[in-house]
């Protein structure tokens, strides 16, 4: 059965959340938004392309930073309203220069920083 990006369930702004996960380690790297065209571009090129809500433009991950995400596999959740992108990540995934955007834990009511920026 051929996949059609239009078959996904997008929000009222035409967006769907996409969770990037390191394909080798399983580590969750980040969450960003995609629209149908970003999904199609990602599948066509193998370079993960998101939709930037602040810039209202396509955002090819790593285009300016060099921290490229190459798609290994795209998965659709059971409700078709969220994507899991298994990727090969070059360098840090987070704009703070950390491996993952999820570097802060809440432990005993306090925020704990789990990792420093990569050098």
Curated annotation (Swiss-Prot):
GO terms for molecular function: magnesium ion binding; phosphoribosyl-AMP cyclohydrolase activity; zinc ion binding. InterPro entries: PRA-CH, PRib_AMP_CycHydrolase_dom, PRib_AMP_CycHydrolase_sf. Zn(2+) binds at residues 78, 94, 101. It is an enzyme of class 3 (hydrolase). Mg(2+) binds at residues 77, 79, 81. Coiled coil: none annotated. Its EC number is 3.5.4.19. It catalyses: 1-(5-phospho-beta-D-ribosyl)-5'-AMP + H2O = 1-(5-phospho-beta-D-ribosyl)-5-[(5-phospho-beta-D-ribosylamino)methylideneamino]imidazole-4-carboxamide. Its cofactor is Mg(2+); Zn(2+). Pathway: Amino-acid biosynthesis; L-histidine biosynthesis; L-histidine from 5-phospho-alpha-D-ribose 1-diphosphate: step 3/9. One of its GO terms (biological process) is L-histidine biosynthetic process. Pfam families: PRA-CH (PF01502). Binds 1 Mg(2+) ion per subunit. Binds 1 zinc ion per subunit. Signal peptide: none annotated. It comes from the Bacteria. It is found in: Cytoplasm. Keywords: Amino-acid biosynthesis, Cytoplasm, Histidine biosynthesis, Hydrolase, Magnesium, Metal-binding, Zinc. GO terms for cellular component: cytoplasm. Belongs to the PRA-CH family. Catalyzes the hydrolysis of the adenine ring of phosphoribosyl-AMP. HAMAP family: HisI. Homodimer. This is Phosphoribosyl-AMP cyclohydrolase. It comes from Dinoroseobacter shibae (strain DSM 16493 / NCIMB 14021 / DFL 12).
């Amino acid at each position: 059965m051929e996949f059609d990006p239009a078959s996904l369930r997008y929000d009222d702004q035409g967006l769907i959340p996409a969770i990037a996960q390191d394909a080798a380690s399983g580590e969750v790297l980040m969450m960003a938004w995609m629209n149908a065209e970003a999904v199609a571009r990602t599948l066509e090129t193998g370079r993960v392309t998101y939709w930037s809500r602040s810039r209202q433009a396509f955002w090819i991950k790593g285009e300016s930073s060099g921290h490229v995400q190459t798609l290994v596999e795209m998965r659709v959740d059971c409700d078709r309203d969220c994507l899991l992108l298994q990727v090969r990540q070059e360098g840090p995934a987070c704009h703070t220069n950390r491996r993952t955007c999820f570097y802060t834990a809440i432990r005993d009511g306090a925020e704990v920083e789990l990792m420093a920026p990569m050098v």
